[in-house]
Amino acid sequence: MKWANLLFTSLLFLSSNAIASGVGFTQITLTDDPKRPLNTAIWYPTQEVSNTTLIGDNPAFVGTKIIKDAQIQSSTFPVVLLSHGYRGNWRNQNWLATEIAKRGYIVAAADHPGTTTFDHSLKQAAKWWERPRDMSRILDHLLTSARWKQHVNADNVTAIGHSLGGWTVMQLAGAKVDRQTFKSRCLIYPNPRTCGLAEELGLAKVQAHEPSSKDLSDPRIKRVVTLDLGLAGSFSINSLNDITVPTLILAAGIDIGDLPQALESGYIAEHIPLYSRRYKVYENATHFSFIQDCKQGAEVILEDEVPGDGIICKDGVGTSREELHQLILNDIVSFLNR
């Protein structure tokens, strides 16, 4: 019943706040840390409607229509920060970013160095603490850049992450990495996918230049949303118990073999105080139902490129990814409007 009420609220929100005529889009590189430049994509409301182009579109995946480098609409807008999964990129949640921007948000996402499609640097990947810092750096830019600062509502900032991105945004909310907890969990649940990444992601042992404090929270983040997150077992239970930031936990009901939601999303839902979180499982969704939609024939294309990658296009029987995306979008917009 709570979710039904929230959905009704969201429909009212959509009708009263869908003020943008189009979605503007731009890409920048953040160089405030020269050792970790951030390729960043930004979607935003615009009154412009002409000269649309497709982004994130290729033979396998469906893109979205945007207006490149359009003038931002004259107003202030809440902010959503997006974090992609392991070896993903901003295009994975392009569908979500575009829809949220249509509804009056500035949305920004970076390709995390070391764990993105186009950068597999082991040195960068092992700097696990830099992922949440990447998100804080993006917000710093939006709040200080001449182009954006007058358009940002600094009191309304949400962070959303898929898979490893969900793990990233949980740290912004106050979750703290604890190696002993992770080691113990891996002895009980030796998942080769999550436990097998411990070395690469710098979680097996203390890294050079690792911050002494595991608290990477950012008080400017007012809400977080996780989309079938992974590596939840690396968080200390005490830190999850202490989270007060409103948290929406969305999970895939179909286990494709490496991220069972009961041990990942379910773990954080179990330990975050009930008053701080909402938890929903989409029974017909897989881990990849949260990324962009596949075109007809995409499964064959992906399988030919990398055997086994065809699974990226699989959803539950009798359910389309487009339908799942609409459900996910409705739930996220409802949460944003709380």
Model-derived features: where do they sit?
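Short beta-strand/loop motif that positions the catalytic acidic residue
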Residues: 243, 249-251
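Catalytic active-site module of serine/aspartate enzymes centered on a nucleophile-bearing elbow/loop
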Residues: 296-338
